[in-house]
Amino acid sequence: MMKANFIVVEGLEGAGKSTAIKTVLDTLKAAGIENIVNTREPGGTPLAEKMRGLVKEEHEGEDLKDMTELLLLYAARVQLVENVIKPALANDQWVVGDRHDLSSQAYQGGGRQIDASLMKNLRDTTLGEFKPAFTLYMDIDPRVGLERARGRGELDRIEKMDISFFERTRERYLELANADDSIVIINAEQSIEDVAQDIKAALNKWLAAQ
């Protein structure tokens, strides 16, 4: 029997991650994998959800510093990995995550331009060798994605960043995805049907190789 794995969906705002996750869950279930835990980052535990609020919300009269944001994200990630993801995998449950460490590498390392060696040290110190078995990166032009996000309602603190921030974030996402065989890039600007088809094909190909 195939061992339980950690699968992650990544992407910019408006890339269709929620729809992609539904397609991933449907594809796994069609492959006979029923025991699945869903997570999201930042968040996924009561304490990590509080940290999510601190990262996402505006703070009246106080600017959330880039380093504070980064440390909050990793603190939330450690809570989730140690208290939810690792125990689930040990219990033979698959885990499907809405974002993981790649988000920090792209948003904070790329978008915020935080030093690459600091990013690597922080990841290595907090996560060690732990990483997803398979990642789908939903690639979209930031302008298209933000237009979609605006259509959903009010933007959060990060979604209000200028376009150059998201362009740097996308550039880093693509750089990292192209350097890692466990990450598949999906064109998220296609029709919903074509995106779903590409996700199913990529995931089924990966499952067949396990």
Swiss-Prot record:
Cross-referenced InterPro entries: P-loop_NTPase (IPR027417), Thymidylate_kin-like_dom (IPR039430), Thymidylate_kin_CS (IPR018095), Thymidylate_kinase (IPR018094)
EC number(s) on file: 2.7.4.9
Reactions the enzyme catalyzes: dTMP + ATP = dTDP + ADP
Pfam families the record matches: Thymidylate_kin
The organism's place on the tree of life at top rank: Bacteria
SUPFAM superfamilies linked: P-loop containing nucleoside triphosphate hydrolases (SSF52540)
Biological process according to GO: dTDP biosynthetic process; dTTP biosynthetic process; dUDP biosynthetic process
Keywords: ATP-binding, Kinase, Nucleotide biosynthesis, Nucleotide-binding, Transferase
UniProt-recorded Gene Ontology molecular function terms: ATP binding; dTMP kinase activity
Disulfide bonding pattern of the chain: none
Binding residues for ATP: G11, L12, E13, G14, A15, G16, K17, S18
Family: Belongs to the thymidylate kinase family.
HAMAP family from the UniProt entry: Thymidylate_kinase
Protein name: Thymidylate kinase
Phylogenetic classification of the source organism: Bacteria, Pseudomonadati, Pseudomonadota, Gammaproteobacteria, Vibrionales
